Amino acid sequence: MAGINSILQTFEGLGEGDRAETIKVLSDMMREGTPRQPAKKKVNGFMGYRSYYSSMFSQLPQKERSPILTTLWQQDPFHKEWDFMCAVYSAIRDQLAEQNVTLQTWIQFAVTPLGIAPRTGYMEALGWVLTRLDDGTHTLQRMDVPDIRYHLQPMNGLGLFLSCLNGGLPIFDPQNIISQLSDPAFDVICINTQVPKIPGTFDTMSGFRQLAKQNPALAMSSLFQLPDTDPLIAQGVGMYEFHSVVSQPVQNHGMPPTTVPPMESHSHEDNMDFAKINEAELDAILTMYDTNTNGYIDPNKPQGF
């Protein structure tokens, strides 16, 4: 109240012209509202690289550490992988921050599916030796230039995220991130590596298959862009006998519990264990979704023409 009274007293002491001008200024200020926060700067590959490998030289002063990391980066064979990893991080940084996942945590789980050399053994793997000179400073020497074998197939942002998720990335609610990376607008975030000498397994589909084996409800939810509480998800999981995962009826925001279609009785040994489904079986399941009716095709019913 004291603030309001002060404003009123100020207005009472103003002339008509000054009062009108003051009201206009205040109105413009209110219309502008709170200034928008500037967009966060995107993390580039070198920033991620430096963040990850800097701890290898924690015993060195900053004036030595920076040029060493710059030299290593210039000769690092994984520039495209680092740029890609950090581009994906920048795209989902806000969602990751909401779940307390930092850049360091993201990198920790992303280096493995991208085939990037880990901190442990990095110098040896790429043929580098750090030598201490007589004056106490340090210099880099490269004793060998190894033949790097690329194990990575082309991957998009969703494929990398699924691989990190399967590797243990601590995300308790991945649905929003999966939905965002499934948007065609983010499909440009992709990587095309050199043709690998040894075929890799960390493409998008293999990452999705692994997620489906661990959490079929979440996998179907991300595939069909529906909340994992939607009755359709329980129908799809239940129809194909994923009993070990869906043990309780799904509630749909006040609607009656979803009824899973009745199935023939099987012994515990005969029940289909989703973790043992091979890729051909999973592919067959994924093709059972009818996009025209937004429902699953019951494989036991004859289909009309």
UniProtKB/Swiss-Prot annotation:
Keywords: DNA-binding, Fertilization, Nucleus, Transcription, Transcription regulation. Belongs to the MATALPHA1 family. This is Mat- sexual cell fertilization-promoting factor. Controls fertilization, probably by determining the mating type. May be involved in the post-fertilization steps of the sexual cycle besides mat+. It is required for the developmental events that occur in the female organ after fertilization. GO terms for molecular function: DNA binding, bending. The gene is FMR1. GO terms for biological process: positive regulation of mating-type specific transcription, DNA-templated; single fertilization. It is found in: Nucleus. Its main location: nucleus. It comes from Podospora anserina (Pleurage anserina). It comes from the Eukaryota. One of its GO terms (cellular component) is nucleus. Residues 38-93 bind DNA.
